[in-house]
Amino acid sequence: AASSTAAAASGSANVGVCIYQFADNFMTLYRTDLEEYLKDMGYSVTIMDGKNDQNTQTEQINTFLQQGVDVLIINPVQTTSAQTIVDTISPSGTPIVFINREPDKAVLDSYAGKCCYVGADARQSGTYQGELILETETQGDINGDGKITYIMCKGDPENIDAQYRTEYSIKALTDAGKEVECLYEYLDNWDQTTAQQDVANALSQYGDKIEVVFCNNDAMALGALQSIQQAGRTVGKDVYLVGVDALSEAVQNVVDGNMTGTVLNDDVGQATAAAAATKLYVEGSKVEQYYWVDYVKVTKENAAQYIK
């Protein structure tokens, strides 16, 4: 902690960043932004790739602690390991900024004043997905039988974002008084190829019954789109398709009418907030426990401005 005080006086700091996996599209955008903002503040930044393995990430955290970094920014491989991560770091007094994957509040409480979370509220992203469907011409009920029949492509089952998006996308429909029927929920673990295969199977099994394909992220939605097109279906005419992340390829598909919509997980807003929280820790200022960054609904009307 003494080093943090010295760092604050000189305005410089060493920041260690642990990303769950460099191969993740969204986290690549995020870490590029984050590195830029931290360096603009005059901090030296080291970013490590957890390679989607918690043991690897834990070793990286220990290395950063040995090096005496001033602040740790952590995008945990497993949110279920967040308490262990805090217990590893807390004896050193090093502040932690958790990003993008939300730990339980109890974890943040256990290291009060030295630990915060910067992210988007995944409930909102799910709600926005449901609203995208309610804003379509048929409100999701393409065949007019009085109910919205859908399939769901889900991310990592342990990930709170996946859980909330699955729940709140449908809650938006039922809150609007709609009757819904789930044909099947597929566990596609955020993966494009897995989703492509599952949606191909679903389309051959359920055919025209499928009115909406909900995907917890855009990678899975892009996989779903390939199978929808191969099956001779047309998004906007006989099926609706929504994702989350606003990846460039997905946004282009929204512009082209091949996806109903997506939800922007605002990497710029989140990276800005994470860098700001880091600066507060370096300066020894008061840090809030949560910093929430809004999602943005991306439709054909506004999509062009979100193409990166």
Regions found by a protein language model. Give the residues of each.
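A residue-level marker of the well-folded mature domains of exported/periplasmic proteins
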Residues: A1-K308
